[in-house]
Amino acid sequence: MAAGKSYKLQSPSGSVSVEIAVGQDVTWTVSRDGTRVLEPSAISMTLEDGSVWGQNVKVRKTAKRSVSRDLTPWVYRQSSVRESYNELTLQCSGYSMVFRAYDMGAAYRFVAARKEPFKVKEEKASFCFAGNFSAFIPYTREVKDYDSQFSTSCESQYTREPIGQWRKDKIAFLPITVEALDGMKVCITESDLLNYPGMYLSNPDGDNALEAVFPRYPKDIEQGGHNMLQGIIKSREDYLAEVSAQEAFPWRIVIVSKEDKELLTCDIPWLLGREPAPEMDFSWVKPGKVAWDWWNAWNLYGVDFEAGVNNATYKYYIDFAAKNGIEYVILDEGWAVNKKADLFQVVPEIDLPMLCEYAAGKGVGLILWAGYWAFEKDMEKACREYSEMGVKGFKVDFMDRDDQPMIQFYRRAAETAARYHLMVDFHGAFKPSGLQRTWPNVINYEGVYGLENVKGNKKYEIDLVTYEVSIPFVRLVAGPSDYTQGAMRNATRKNFRYVSSEAMSQGTRCRQLAEYVVFDAPLNMLCDSPSNYLKEQECLKFIADVPTVWDQTVALEGKAGEYVAVARRKGDTWYVGALTDWNARELTLDLSFIGGVPLMEVFRDGANAHRAARDYKHEWKEFPLDGKVSVKMAPGGGWAAVFRPEPQPWENTDKDWARYSYYEEKNKDVETRPRAVLFGDSITRNWVREDRRWLKNHNFVGRGISGQTTAQLLCRIRPDVIDLNPEYMVLLIGINDIARNNGYISVENTFGNIVSMVQLAQANGIKPVMCTLCPAREIGWRKRVGDPRPMIDKLNALISAYAKENGIPLVDYNSALRIPDGSMDPRYETDAVHPNKDGYKVMEQTLLSVLEKL
């Protein structure tokens, strides 16, 4: 094909366009809505034999394809992700260049097509801009020479300055967000980084172009660094990577947002990660929260033992976690003998088998901290033996590199841990780059200037408040972060001090709570001491209850470096979090999409939070009819709220305890006799949301209310069932009695209420259909009730026996959705209690198979 050829590619909606110019060089240009955001930028790859991909190019063949599909992640901030892009492949001699256009960005990669493995000498990836735009730049920290900058934990505050003022001797790690034309933001990152060094950016010429730089392949590595746990590079080769003949190189990504808040929910980096192997089952991966020891320096008080790295301390942490529904406890640095880099030399004060057994008996998992060198040395043995002991994962720390061998270590660690059903939390790490999609047991990454820096990092001036309203638009675009929030000691800007053993956060108490909503973190730390949390029960309950993975995430408001507000849904419950910079701020959030919630639980900055950052107000407020909620934040403040459809203790005194009003208007619209009323709680209510058409097609009416118990259904059976005069009443209820949503009730009394409703239906000429309760391994909003499976089985046995003795049809949802351990099949659940769309399909078939026989 002739030189000088130009190719064009557009995203599915046409919002993003890519132009590729091919000839003596290859350049790509990216525009959004007609505005060019990336000027022609050269790309190439130089091999060890001197050949250059991307110079004097002859395209032999082109191929286009379009993809539009819904994906179900194992672990993510959404239960469903829409993937939609157009792709162009330019096939050349020995390689291809693949370009993709999404509606919010574009990406490219090189793919080898050779017969033998080879080495990559250099790669050119330019990012050219039309002006000297400002950017959020995470420079590596000060080191003695240029090459040493590649030994980094990727923890730096942002320097916000024009790219033309880039420090010539400095490099910066990814992501970087550039403030471009017309208020647009351009975020640069990478994904599918599995066998190649990580990309950094530099600007050696001081112009409007950023250039990629990469750590060269290590030649000599010595054990050293922090407690002899790091690999120290002594010399490097003159090439970047050794790769396979068919190597698919990492994606180079340019994300373009018209509004800053679009960056908060951009899925492109995750989508460009490699899909897990189809035969892999990651249902065993259990996200959750962790009681952490290191940040609070094992600082317990009011106990009758000396706190520290010992059995008594960790049993206390385990008891604390169990009592408050916290899934994990971490044993951070100190459980293994110092400076030995040996995970099997345990200090005498720690009895790991005993602690694992003790934790398991309390329903708590243990996670072990491991230095890089020690974990690399004994990876297989450590994973095998500690998984057999009952350990649930490793927090692997102090890698502080992303050359090719280190990238390969990450992948090997993920693969090995997965074989033994272990999670991995990488600290001293680079940003997420797709591995967390390929191996969902990679549950979190650090690579962030987190709260640990308040413990005494006096070398650098610290401003975490500004940083915290910047990372959602930069670092978190790449993926989740282990920021480790949750401090109960809080300080204003003026009052902040470094106190290592009794550390404090910058900003208000409510800020710490809101960060659990704003920041993505499938494994989320509680950084403070159990002793401090136990004095702050309201805050502890909020943190313990907040989910770590979500069904839906909505970006509400945001301006990078100034403020951010996010809403997230898990099941029927919504959480909203907002943060501001050092300026007091008031936002009006449009939450009308939530709906159906009478009250909201709010944590807001107190009237004196600008002076005493711990000051906050916890209250329940009516949810406005128009859904517009005013949010006021103090300097360095935050705001958090929960919107629960199920009744809470404060609702017990409400005049409409039974929620008669919920369906009052809808009942007036029922003109024809329903074939059946499906009567129940949130499982029935969600059915309407998930498959309204199916209900309508079968003349079924849904009358479920989230959180309700048998006592409440018994109150409203007349208006919501009897007065509608259906042929059948399909009764599915009882899980919220077991959860004690309205306080204690025995299984026998729950069953008695069910029988009363059956008899009321019969007395009014309605045929009852009884249902077994769906399986559930835990009740997320009431974890303190313990394992619900024995009570579910007991209640189901009573229901089944009564139905059989009295000739009443029985729909056995439990058997249809259950796996051998009594849990709901992971294919059918959203949160251990509630079915997903596939679960409802199974329930529909099960119900119809019974009704068709009547």
Task: Annotate each predicted stretch with a short phrase.
Residues L678, T684-R703, T710-G752, C774-G780:
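Oxyanion-hole/transition-state-stabilizing segment in secreted/luminal serine hydrolases
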Residues C774-L854:
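Catalytic His-Asp segment of secreted/periplasmic serine-dependent ester chemistry enzymes
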Residues D528-Y575, L579, H610-R614:
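Glycan-recognition and catalytic regions of carbohydrate-active enzymes
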Residues K559-L599, W639-A641:
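Carbohydrate-binding surface patches
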Residues Q648-F679, T684-W694, D723-L724, E852-L854:
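N-terminal secretory targeting modules
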Residues K5-G273:
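N-terminal accessory beta-strand-rich subdomains and adjacent acidic, glycine-rich linkers
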Residues L331-T508:
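Aromatic- and carboxylate-enriched substrate-binding clefts and catalytic-loop regions
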Residues W620-P647:
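C-terminal beta-strand-rich structural cap/linker in extracellular carbohydrate-active enzymes
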